[in-house]
């Protein structure tokens, strides 16, 4: 328990101690969230509004120039935007020119293409002789033609026959209606299917009662009705 109390005291002391000197900083932390850091710089540098997060951001970046306007708009300072320090640019990003690495893929040397036409006497899949000097030369047969050549006989020219005159086209006769090959036959009568639900007469809710005579309004007619 005493350790937690000591830790809480040290934490409160760290927040209560004045901050190290910083340009544009009054030396204390104001935990008010009513004004932002950029507005306080433009309004009054003596009453600077800072929070621990805003003080840390002001330590790692240069403060806004006091031109009387904000460069990024009024809504930016309500969001946490991590900004890298511009005072110490990384040195490993810039390489000397002789250490430049090409971005594109390395170009492979172009292999000269061999002719696709097979050499007579050699198969396209078998290697040539000059690539195998130690092997004995194989017996090669002379290139033979698949069919013996025959002398071309001169053809006798036949006399050209006269062209016959074209006959006139006959008129097309109307097509007669043909009887259908398979006349439509009436289907045989099908048997009636039994009803799915049996239709039984439902008993009337009110039984049929004989109508009663209306009572006569006149005394003389009442006797006749009775």
UniProtKB/Swiss-Prot annotation:
Start-end of Pro residues biased regions: 183-192
GO MF annotation terms: structural constituent of tooth enamel
UniProt keyword list: Biomineralization, Extracellular matrix, Phosphoprotein, Repeat, Secreted, Signal
GO CC annotations, alphabetized: extracellular region
Start and end residues of each stretch annotated as Disordered: 86-196
Coiled-coil ranges (or none): none
Cell compartments where the protein resides: Secreted, Extracellular space, Extracellular matrix
InterPro entries (UniProt xref): Amelogenin
BP GO terms, sorted: enamel mineralization
Feature: compositional bias, Low complexity: 88-120, 137-182
Residues with PTM Phosphoserine: 32
Pfam short name (any one): Amelogenin
Family assignment from sequence similarity: Belongs to the amelogenin family.
Function recorded in the entry: Plays a role in the biomineralization of teeth. Seems to regulate the formation of crystallites during the secretory stage of tooth enamel development. Thought to play a major role in the structural organization and mineralization of developing enamel.
Name of the protein in its database record: Amelogenin
Gene name per UniProt: AMEL
């Amino acid at each position: 328990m005493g350790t937690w109390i000591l830790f809480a005291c040290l934490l409160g002391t760290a927040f209560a101690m004045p901050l190290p000197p910083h340009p544009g900083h009054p030396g204390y932390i104001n935990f008010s969230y009513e004004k932002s850091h950029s507005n306080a710089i433009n309004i009054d540098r003596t009453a600077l509004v800072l929070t621990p997060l805003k003080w840390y951001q002001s330590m790692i970046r240069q403060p806004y120039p006091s031109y009387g306007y904000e460069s990024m708009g009024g809504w930016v300072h309500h969001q946490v935007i991590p900004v890298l320090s511009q005072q110490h640019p990384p040195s490993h990003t810039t390489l000397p020119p002789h250490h430049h690495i090409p971005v594109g893929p390395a170009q492979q040397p172009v292999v000269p293409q061999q002719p696709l036409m097979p050499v007579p006497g050699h198969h396209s899949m078998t290697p040539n002789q000059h690539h195998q000097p130690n092997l004995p030369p194989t017996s090669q047969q002379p290139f033979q033609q698949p069919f013996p050549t025959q002398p071309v006989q001169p053809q006798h020219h036949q006399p050209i026959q006269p062209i016959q005159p074209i006959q006139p086209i006959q008129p097309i006769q109307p097509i007669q209606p043909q009887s259908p090959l398979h006349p439509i036959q009436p289907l045989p009568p099908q048997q009636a299917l039994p009803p799915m639900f049996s239709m039984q007469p439902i008993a009337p809710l009110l039984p049929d009662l004989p109508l009663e005579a209306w009572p006569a309004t006149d005394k003389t007619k009442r006797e006749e009705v009775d």
